[in-house]
């Protein structure tokens, strides 16, 4: 982007960063929505370690919901039973989530970076290594954005988990039902593993991204896609390492009174917190159970990060230009 700034965290005002983040979140979510729905369906499907076919037999006998076998078969099944719109289930809360999450994340990332640069000034030889600065700022941004927008994340999961028979007919009804049956804490089911997953994930993501971005920008890739490539590589590395906690979060999010009403009717009960849930999954499904849906998650995370970072940088560049053309102080482009 800027000819002077080599790092994402050094560019744009807070308002420009917020607007660019919201724009990136809006576009990214719509593009990757089908893969997100598929990922959630696969993550919520459990298998018995002692009898891998038990889940399928139960589904056939008691109507436990469809058995998904991979990304493409899952897409075909959803299209056949729920239609094209089934791949965009939960898109309204998800769009709200992605827009608000990205806006908060990039704004916090910029603010934490400025704080660290002021607390550890370069001219006094106290400056943190760039990778450490990026990790701290990214981890903080991910934690804050997740905590602020978590109810929307929970709603996104529950709507995506619905089959033909809807548990919640509308977003407003979902909010009312959850409050009436689960209380305020119902909106924050799974927040613990959510934070435990997102903090190292976003720390690693921004650390790798900020390291690769200036190097890839020198390659003059077509369509200025260096930011997209950096986003893909950073996302794959970060997602693989933290995926089990993402799966645990999803399983906990659909607990409560509506647990048996989703497309998977026999979702197990997990009521002992994050550590106990991990132990239960490993005991019942083996270590592989913690990585159920990893392939589609990487297929989703890679393009999502590519679209997000590419769109963010293009949008930020546009907003900086608009700011420079209008009244007030000018910023480098």
Curated annotation (Swiss-Prot):
Superkingdom classification of source: Eukaryota
Chief location category: mitochondrion
Solcar repeat placement: 12-115, 129-215, 222-318
TM ranges: 17-35, 96-112, 135-155, 190-209, 221-238, 293-310
Alphabetical UniProt keywords: Membrane, Mitochondrion, Mitochondrion inner membrane, Repeat, Transmembrane, Transmembrane helix, Transport
Organism: Neurospora crassa (strain ATCC 24698 / 74-OR23-1A / CBS 708.71 / DSM 1257 / FGSC 987)
The keyword NADP belongs to this UniProt entry's keyword annotation: no
Function comment: Mitochondrial transporter that mediates uptake of thiamine pyrophosphate (ThPP) into mitochondria.
Name listed for the protein in its UniProt record: Mitochondrial thiamine pyrophosphate carrier 1
InterPro entries in the record: Mit_carrier, Mitochondrial_sb/sol_carrier, Mt_carrier_dom_sf
């Amino acid at each position: 982007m800027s000819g002077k700034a080599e790092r994402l965290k050094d560019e744009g005002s807070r308002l420009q960063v917020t607007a660019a983040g919201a724009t990136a979140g809006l576009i990214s979510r719509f593009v990757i929505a089908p893969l997100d729905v598929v990922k959630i369906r696969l993550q919520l499907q459990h298998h018995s370690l002692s009898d891998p076919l038990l889940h399928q037999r139960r589904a056939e006998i008691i109507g436990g919901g469809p058995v998904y076998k991979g990304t493409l078969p899952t897409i075909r099944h959803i299209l056949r039973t729920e239609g094209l719109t089934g791949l965009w289930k939960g898109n309204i809360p998800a769009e709200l989530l992605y827009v608000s999450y990205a806006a908060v994340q990039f704004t916090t990332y910029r603010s934490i970076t400025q704080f660290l640069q002021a607390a550890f000034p370069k001219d006094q030889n106290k400056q943190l290594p760039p990778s450490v600065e990026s990790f701290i700022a990214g981890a903080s941004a991910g934690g804050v954005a997740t905590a602020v927008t978590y109810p929307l994340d929970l709603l996104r999961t529950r709507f995506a988990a619905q089959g033909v028979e809807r548990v919640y007919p509308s977003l407003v009804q979902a909010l009312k039902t959850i409050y009436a049956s689960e209380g305020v804490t119902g909106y924050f089911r799974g927040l613990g593993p959510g934070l435990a997953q997102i903090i190292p994930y976003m720390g690693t993501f921004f650390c790798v991204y900020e390291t690769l971005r200036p190097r890839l920008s020198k390659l003059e890739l077509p369509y200025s896609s260096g930011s997209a490539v950096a986003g893909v590589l950073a996302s794959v590395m970060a997602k693989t390492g933290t995926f089990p906690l993402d799966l645990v979060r999803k399983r906990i999010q659909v607990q409560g009174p509506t647990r048996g009403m989703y497309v998977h009717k026999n979702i197990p009960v997990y009521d002992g917190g994050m550590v106990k849930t991990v132990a239960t999954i490993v005991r019942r499904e083996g270590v592989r159970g913690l990585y159920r849906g990893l392939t589609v998650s990487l297929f989703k995370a890679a393009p999502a990060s590519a679209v997000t970072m590419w769109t963010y940088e293009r949008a930020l560049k546009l907003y900086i230009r608009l700011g420079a053309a209008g009244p007030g102080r000018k910023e480098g482009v």
